[in-house]
Every structure is written in C-alpha cells, then in structure tokens.
Swiss-Prot record:
Organism field: Shigella flexneri serotype 5b (strain 8401)
PANTHER family xref list: FORMATE ACETYLTRANSFERASE, FORMATE ACETYLTRANSFERASE 1
List of residues that carry N6-acetyllysine: K48, K88, K92
NCBIfam families per the UniProt record, alphabetical: spare_glycyl
Name this protein carries in UniProt: Autonomous glycyl radical cofactor
Length: 127
C-alpha cells in the first residue's frame, strides 16, 4: 500500500518538511520534494530515512493507462484492382486518397515500395 507523508521531525535536517510516498509492501520511500539532500523521484529504503515522525497526507491515485501492443485499424473502402490500376496508371487517379497510420495521403505520392506495402497489408485472404 502506498501512503503519502510529510516528515515533521527527523535527525537529518534535509528530511524536515519533505514529502514522500511510502510503499509498505516494498519497504521503499519515493521522494516527492525535499529542500536538499534528496532528488525528486529518488527511491530509498524506508530504513534510510532513520528515526522520523510524520503526518499522513491524502494521496489521489489515478488509474494508469497502459498500452501494450495495441491495435490500429485503417479503413480504406476500395477494391484491390483499383489500387493495382493506380500503380500502373497514376494519371487516372490523381485524387485517390487512402488512410496510412491515421493520416490521409494521396496514393500516388507514396513510393512504389510503400504502394506495394499498402496493397499487401490492405487486402488479406484471412485474419
């Protein structure tokens, strides 16, 4: 459990009135702010704080959003043959716009390699 504290009495003057987060499960303390001697976000063993007195301060914990290998979907509504024809005859498709990585881009402005990649990724036989 994480507890927020303000140190009110300590043998080490650098700790006086400093704010910390105590992790009782790990036995660690994370410095939030101190006048001197400790850096912001520095983590030390609680025992390193020595003999201290403190008052608890409320800590608001916001849920952390974690994105781990998320998915991204671009939807292009057209036929494979249209893109293949645009590769062969770009002059026929000057306004052909597709979605690539969340951006709208003119298909003809892509390199031939990028065009082939879009076609390969856009049209699959199965998922």
């Amino acid at each position: 459990m994480i507890t927020g504290i303000q140190i009110t009495k300590a043998a080490n003057d650098d700790l006086l009135n400093s704010f910390w987060l105590l992790d009782s499960e790990q036995g660690e303390a994370r410095c939030i702010v101190a006048k001197a001697g400790y850096a912001e976000d520095e983590v030390v063993a609680v025992s390193k704080l020595g003999d201290i007195e403190y008052r608890e301060v409320p800590v608001e914990v916001k849920p952390e959003v974690r994105v781990e290998g998320g998915q991204h979907l671009n939807v292009n509504v057209l036929r494979r043959e249209t893109l293949e024809d645009a590769v062969k005859h770009p002059e026929k498709y000057p306004q052909l716009t597709i979605r690539v990585s969340g951006y709208a881009v003119r298909f003809n402005s892509l390199t031939p390699e990028q065009q082939r990649d879009v076609i390969a990724r856009t049209f699959t036989e199965s998922l």
